[in-house]
Curated annotation (Swiss-Prot):
Residues 577-652 form the BRCT domain. This is DNA ligase. NAD(+) binds at D29, S30, E31, Y32, D33, S78, L79, E107, R130, E164, K278, K302. It comes from Streptococcus gordonii (strain Challis / ATCC 35105 / BCRC 15272 / CH1 / DL1 / V288). InterPro entries: BRCT_dom, BRCT_dom_sf, DisA/LigA_HHH, DNA_ligase, DNA_ligase_AS, DNA_ligase_CS, DNAligase_adenylation, DNAligase_N. It catalyses: NAD(+) + (deoxyribonucleotide)n-3'-hydroxyl + 5'-phospho-(deoxyribonucleotide)m = (deoxyribonucleotide)n+m + AMP + beta-nicotinamide D-nucleotide. Keywords: DNA damage, DNA repair, DNA replication, Ligase, Magnesium, Manganese, Metal-binding, NAD, Zinc. Zn(2+) binds at C395, C398, C413, C418. One of its GO terms (cellular component) is cytosol. GO terms for molecular function: DNA binding; DNA ligase (NAD+) activity; metal ion binding.
Length: 652
């Protein structure tokens, strides 16, 4: 009986792969149904013997309590965008400085939701959303209902793969037809439909909506030599892999593919919003490395944004956390890139003057990066008024005088007690890239502020359940959930806190670099400007901003309150002892390593106290060169920099 159940699971998973992924079924529908019914019958008789990879999980429904956070073992990076051929040429030139003979694999950029799938011994054990790249949401049960995701692999591999989950156009039309018949609001576009479906708490809904996937990356260490090889491996393992791709040896060939796909785009059975261009050889990818947000070996070309005409009705002026006052146009509604747009950014007061935007103008609207609606220009032939837009002289939040500094394009409110700035600052503090307090978004911040429950970030940690129950629409469950999220954030590594404080010019990357150097926020607060300027990639602008921030009495009070509330102020990443072998040394890796992966080599260097840089300069102390080292090695030799090999590093 147990053997028969195992045999049926294996057969049905194989047949499902042939049907959904290869579109080449080897058995008829009736044969499949007969085997499926036999398995269902056996599982009903022997529920304790049901295998986790059973295909019956795909259609069975369960109601989930919610989605837990999922720590990605391997970070998911975003991609640098390109909107013109010139930007692709610049990317190509950067790559060819290091690898003159580089080739590129061009793949379709599917307009869906990024997912990560983890397998242990060939069995799917976890599936998650991208989230902030480090922490996503565990949506394993929902992903098990996506029919072309294999529950088991043909080999007992432990592997993590990445891809895109999307809703085909036909499925999107069917879902919206059903929603229309049921009197429900229709989804704006397939991407929103896919994202909404994967966040359903009722898994049976996911099973009915016919989502699909394309996998494109092996995130765990791989023995493959090229991106082409990776895609072939994924296909052999049973994953859906998009066959519409091309290997290009020149940027001209890349552009030819972009133009060809652009012409065929509307005929595809799924939505795409661009082409992803990747350096094909994985050794070259490792050598080129990453910025804090994106790989240097890939770029995403985005197709030109759709443009529509709309009439300007009015302008709202809103205050951001740094005091910048931004104008937003209220427009007659238009359909743009699958969504209804009635508001669009006007950027700043200088932009309004430059484009000569006036009251009641007809304007061209587009989505910058296919995401943010923005006003592009005026249709002057349809102008009905010569009246200029009213530009405020007072802050719309606190009524303080607005300033327009000579070196800035924006109006700015400099009142530190401005309610809008405080609320925006609180929302930033709780945001995903900062303290990542789930549930503490702008709407909840506004409610807390209105009831005078929170006035600064330390006040967040003074909140209790009773405070949260005062908020509109908050019940015991939602109050407990937010309270627990606040408490959990106390243990974040301090670079998240530093970024969350919203110090001008100090982004997430600078926060990490600073805490790697000074180890905790109190030590950073005592640092001299010269110490900060001496750090590679940081400059005087950041040093002055930090010095000014920490010199304020209010900052010292705030840090003390945070510490007393139990918020961690220390960096929890790798810290090198002051007497470590490479303490304070700037080291560059180049060439192909034989025994260590580049990630392992970098981690070891960090443990030894080194700062690992991506390029060779006069500030470089040491270059570790593997096989086929290129221009970095040549430059190191030219500058007289110490050069060692992988064997030397392994002995340390």
């Amino acid at each position: 009986m147990k053997d028969r159940m195992s045999e049926l699971v294996s057969l049905l998973n194989r047949y499902a792969h042939e049907y959904y992924t290869k579109d080449a079924p080897s058995v008829s529908d009736s044969e499949y149904d007969q085997l499926y019914r036999e398995l269902v019958s056996l599982e009903e008789q022997y529920p304790n013997e049901i295998l986790p990879e059973s295909p019956t999980h795909r259609v069975g429904g369960k109601v989930l309590d919610g989605f837990e956070k999922y720590q990605h073992q391997y970070p998911l990076y975003s991609l640098q965008d390109a909107f013109s051929r010139a930007e692709l040429v610049a990317f190509d030139e950067r790559v060819r400085k290091e690898f003159p003979d580089a080739s590129y694999l061009c793949e379709l950029k599917i307009d869906g939701l990024s997912i990560s799938l983890a397998y242990e011994n060939g069995i799917l054990v976890a599936g998650a959303t991208r989230g902030d790249g480090s922490i996503g949401e565990n949506i394993t049960e929902n992903l098990k209902r996506v029919k072309d995701i294999p529950l088991t692999l043909p080999e007992p591999l432990t592997i993590t793969v990445r891809g895109e989950c999307y809703m085909p156009k036909a499925s999107f039309d069917a879902v919206n037809q059903l929603r229309q018949e049921n009197g429900e609001a229709e989804f704006a576009n397939p991407r929103n439909a896919a994202a909404g479906t994967l966040r359903q708490l009722d898994t049976s809904v996911v099973a009915k909506r016919n989502l699909a996937t394309f996998l494109y990356q092996e995130a765990s260490p791989t023995s493959e030599a090229t991106q082409e090889d990776v895609l072939e491996k994924l296909s052999q393992l049973g994953f859906s892999v998009n066959e519409k791709r091309v290997l290009a040896s020149t940027i001209d060939q890349v552009w030819d593919f972009i133009e060809k796909v652009g012409q065929e785009r509307d005929k595809l059975p799924y939505e795409i919003d661009g082409i992803v261009i990747k350096v094909n050889h994985l050794a070259a990818q490792e050598e080129l490395g990453f910025t804090v947000k994106a790989p240097k070996w890939a770029i995403a070309y985005k197709f030109p944004a759709e443009e529509k005409e709309a009439q300007l009705l009015s302008v709202d002026w809103t205050v951001g956390r740094t005091g910048v006052v931004t104008p937003t146009a209220n427009l007659t509604p238009v359909q743009l890139a699958g969504t209804t747009v009635s508001r669009a950014t006007l950027h700043n007061v200088d932009y309004i003057r430059e484009k000569d935007i006036r009251k009641d103008d007809t304007v061209i609207v587009y989505k910058a990066g296919d995401i943010i609606p923005a006003v592009l220009r005026v249709v002057e032939g349809k102008r009905v008024s010569d009246e200029h837009l009213d530009v405020p002289s007072k802050c719309p939040s606190c009524q303080s005088d607005l300033l327009h500094f000579e070196d800035e394009v924006a109006l700015r409110c400099i009142n530190p007690l401005c309610p809008a700035q405080i609320m925006e600052g609180l929302a930033h503090f709780a945001s995903r890239d900062a303290m990542n307090i789930s549930g503490l978004g702008p709407a909840v911040v506004e409610k807390l502020f209105a009831k005078d429950l929170v006035r600064d970030v330390a006040g967040i940690y003074r909140l209790n359940i009773e405070d949260l129950l005062q908020l509109e629409n908050f019940k015991e469950k939602s109050a407990n959930k937010l309270y627990n999220a606040i408490q959990a954030s106390k243990s974040n590594s301090a670079e998240k806190l530093l970024f969350g404080l919203g110090i001008r010019h100090v982004g997430s990357k600078a926060s990490r670099i600073l805490l790697e150097k000074f180890h905790d926020i109190p030590s950073l607060a005592q640092a001299e400007q010269e110490e900060i300027v001496s750090i590679d990639s940081l400059g005087m602008v950041i040093a002055k901003s930090l010095h000014s921030y920490f010199a304020q009495e209010g900052t010292q009070i705030l840090l003390k309150e945070l510490e007393e509330a139990g918020v961690n102020l220390a960096y929890l990443g790798e810290k090198a002892a002051a007497d470590a072998v490479l303490s304070g040394k700037t080291v560059v890796l180049t060439g192909k390593l034989e025994t260590l992966t580049r990630t392992q080599a970098k981690e070891k260097l960090l443990r030894l106290g080194a700062n690992v840089a991506g390029s060779v300069s006069k500030k470089t102390d040491l270059v570790i060169a593997g096989a086929d080292a290129g221009s970095k090695l040549a430059k190191a030799q030219e500058l007289g920099i110490e050069i060692q090999d992988e064997a030397w590093l392994e002995q340390l």
